[in-house]
A protein has these predicted regions:
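Conserved pre-catalytic core of RNA-dependent polymerases
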Residues: 1-185, 222
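Catalytic palm active-site di-aspartate
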Residues: 38-41, 57, 91, 95, ...
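A glycine-rich phosphate-binding loop feature that marks nucleotide/adenosyl-phosphate handling sites
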Residues: 40, 253-265, 331, 351, ...
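Active-site palm subdomain of RNA-directed nucleic acid polymerases
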Residues: 73-91, 192-222
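Hydrophobic packing residues in well-ordered alpha-helices of helical domains and bundles
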Residues: 104, 211, 231-234, 238, ...
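Short, conserved micro-motifs composed of acidic
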Residues: 236, 250-283
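Basic, alpha-helical interaction scaffolds
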Residues: 277-344
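A terminal-accessory region detector
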Residues: 349-370
C-alpha cells in the first residue's frame, strides 16, 4: 500500500540513488524500518454464510518500499541457501524451478515403485493448523545461526520479524493497530523463504520415511512388504512428526489429516490397519484427486464436472464477446484445468471423455455448431 509499484517504476530514475542509500543504511545498521512493518488486512469473502468470519480470507497489504528492501535481502539469503545446498530436496514450494507438478510427480513415482515391487505404502497427508502464522521468531533466528548465517544478517531479519503490527480495513473503516508476535508476515517477499528455512529440518527427523513438502503441505510415506510392520513404522513416523511440530510450536490438525494405503495386492491382510485414523481411498493432494490404485476415475469425474460447467460459461459468452476474448476465456476456463497434472493422469481412460469436452469448447470458440 502507499505508493503503487507502477508509480515507483515511472520515477525509478529519480529515486534510485536515495533509495539505494536508504537500503544500504538499513543493512549497515541491521535495522528494518518500523514504518514499513505495519500491514493492512483486508477480509475477502470466499463462500458460504456471509456473517461467518471463517468464510473470509485475510489478505495482507504491505508498503511497497518494504517489498523492495525485502527483495534485496531475499536475493542474498536465497543465494546463500541454494549455493550451499542447504534446503532439502523434499521441499518443492517457493523454489525456483520447482512446482506442484514436480511434487506430485515425485510422489506418484514413489507409489509406482511400490506397485511394481509388490509392497505396501501408507501415505499420511498432514494438515497443519495455520503453520505460517505460528512460526516462532526466536526459533527461526536460532535456526539461522545454526545454518551459519552471519550475525548481522540475523539481526536485520530479527528486526524485520519483531515489533510488527497490523490493522483491519473493511468498507472504509479501519481498526486500531494490533501487535503481531508470531508468524512470517503474510504478503511479504521474505516470508515464504523464512518459512522454508524454519521447516527445513522437518524431513531430517523422518529419515526412514519419504517426505514430500510443498511449503506446509506435508505428506509422509512409509513402505514395507509386511502389512503389520508398515503400521508400526507409520505410527512411529507420525509420532516423530508430532514431536517435531510440538517442539517447534506448530500444531497438527489430526481430524483433517488423512491416511491412504497404496497396494495392488488383491487380498492383503489389513486387520491391524483399521487402527489407522481417517483412512480413505481417495484424497485431494495439491489440486489432484488421488485414489489408492492410481486409476484416476474420481479425478476424472471431478474434472469433467468442472470442465462441463466452464464450457457452459464459454457458450454463454459466445454471442457477447469477440473471438479473441473467447480464446482468452478458453485458455483460463478449459485449458488451464485440463493441463494441470496431465503428466500424472493423462494416460488414464478418463482422458477420452475429458478431451471430448475440450473439443466441444473448441467448437464454441471457432463458431461451429455445438
Amino acid at each position: 500500500y502507499g505508493f503503487s509499484m507502477e508509480l515507483i517504476k515511472n520515477v525509478k530514475d529519480v529515486i534510485i540513488t536515495p533509495l539505494t542509500k536508504l537500503i544500504n543504511l538499513c543493512i549497515q545498521n541491521k535495522t528494518f524500518p518500523k514504518c514499513l512493518k505495519t500491514g493492512i488486512v483486508i477480509p475477502v469473502f470466499k463462500k458460504g454464510e456471509i456473517n461467518d468470519k471463517s468464510n473470509y480470507r485475510p489478505i495482507s497489504l504491505l508498503p511497497v518500499f518494504s517489498k523492495i528492501l525485502e527483495k534485496v535481502l531475499c536475493i542474498q539469503l536465497t543465494k546463500f541457501f541454494e549455493d550451499n545446498k542447504i534446503l532439502v530436496k523434499n521441499q518443492f514450494g517457493f523454489r525456483k524451478g520447482c512446482s506442484t507438478s514436480d511434487a506430485l510427480l515425485s510422489f506418484i513415482d514413489q507409489i509406482s515403485e511400490v506397485f511394481e515391487s509388490g509392497n505396501y505404502c501408507i501415505a499420511t497427508y498432514l494438515d497443519l493448523t495455520k503453520a505460517f502464522d505460528l512460526v516462532s521468531h526466536e526459533t527461526l533466528i536460532r535456526k539461522l545461526y545454526v545454518y551459519n548465517i552471519h550475525p548481522d544478517s540475523c539481526r536485520i531479519i530479527s528486526s524485520f520479524l519483531t515489533e510488527r503490527f497490523q490493522r483491519v480495513s473493511l468498507k472504509g473503516t479501519t481498526s486500531s493497530d494490533l501487535p503481531v508476535s508470531r508468524g512470517v508476515p503474510q504478503g511479504s517477499v521474505l516470508g515464504p523463504l523464512l518459512f522454508l528455512i524454519f521447516f527445513n529440518d522437518f524431513p531430517i527427523e523422518l529419515n526412514e520415511n519419504n517426505v514430500i513438502l510443498f511449503a506446509d503441505d506435508t505428506t509422509i510415506s512409509t513402505t514395507d512388504k509386511n502389512c503389520y510392520e508398515i503400521l508400526t513404522r507409520n505410527q512411529r513416523a507420525i509420532s516423530k512428526a508430532s514431536d517435531w511440530l510440538c517442539s517447534n510450536g506448530l500444531a497438527l490438525n489430526e481430524g483433517k489429516s488423512v491416511n491412504m494405503l497404496f497396494s495392488l495386492k488383491k487380498s492383503p491382510n489389513l486387520a491391524n490397519l483399521t487402527l489407522l485414523p481417517n483412512i480413505q481411498t481417495t484424497t485431494r493432494f495439491l489440486g489432484i484427486t488421488i485414489d489408492d490404485k492410481l486409476l484416476w476415475k474420481e479425478h476424472g469425474v471431478i474434472l469433467a464436472k468442472q470442465l462441463s460447467k466452464n464450457t457452459f460459461m464459454l457458450r454463454s459468452l459466445a454471442n457477447q464477446v469477440s473471438q479473441e476474448v473467447l480464446k482468452i476465456a478458453f485458455s483460463s476456463l478449459i485449458q488451464c484445468f485440463l493441463r494441470y497434472g496431465i503428466l500424472i493422469w493423462g494416460h488414464a481412460s478418463c482422458r477420452h471423455y475429458l478431451f471430448s469436452i475440450q473439443r466441444r469448447a473448441i467448437r464454441i470458440v471457432a463458431g461451429l455448431p455445438y
